[in-house]
Amino acid sequence: MTRAIGIDIGGTGIKGAIIDLDAGELVSDRIKHATPDGGEPEAIIATVAQLVDELGLKGIDHIGVCFPAVVRNGRTMSAANVSKRWIGLDADTLFGTALGRDIHFVNDADAAGYAEAVSGAARGQRGLVIMTTLGTGIGSALINDGVLIANSELGHLKLDGRDAETWAANSAREREGLSFEQWAERLTTYYRYVEALLWPELFVIGGGVSKQHAQFLHLIDVRTPMVPAALRNNAGIMGAAALAVRHAR
């Protein structure tokens, strides 16, 4: 049995659990703490250390952490909804020193997409799978034949001279009071553009609004099959843990 801890750091909450990677499931309670005000590195590291202590490290060699940032070789290159002091930080080393284990940092959308490819809605799918998370912005993950292509930022594709996410994310629907039908027209424009660039085999749609997929998914007019995410709130945790073990190998 291969076990690892997955940690999902967000702007408002930090959650984690122990994952059985062979079974593709949580084998502990999912523990959640509030993200410290300001999202400073030291405070977040302390909160993660507390969470890991509550989960327990017995039999655990690897910890994966997903984070709302572009991550290159364990270094956070951007910061969304957390302190800008994260930019350029060697997160792998800082967290590894604090927790006494090998740490692997990844982008949060990448972690969620990888989990869906390994254990969720895209399990067994060959070719290119694109997961998008529709929320405040549009997060994205590209997985080709099971291999993650890290740090895609498809929410920043330009449509009519502006970032697509400012016009097509779920936050735009809520802000402008769009019906699901009106929003689906925008999503059709967005996903057709992505299709023209990348020709994926499957789109997986995540984010909190994916719980309401029956109200809008069938209205998006694209040629690529489109399915809702299956793992929901556990996707980041599971993907971070799986990528930590894969990275170690």
What is the predicted role of each segment?
Residues 103-108:
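General beta-strand structural signal in soluble alpha/beta enzymes
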Residues 76-88:
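A charged helix-plus-loop insertion that forms the helical arch/lid used to bind
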Residues 139:
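Histidine-centered metal-chelating micro-motifs
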Residues 1-62, 71-75, 93-100, 115-130, ...:
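ATP-binding/phosphotransfer module of carbohydrate and carboxylate kinases, centering on a glycine-rich
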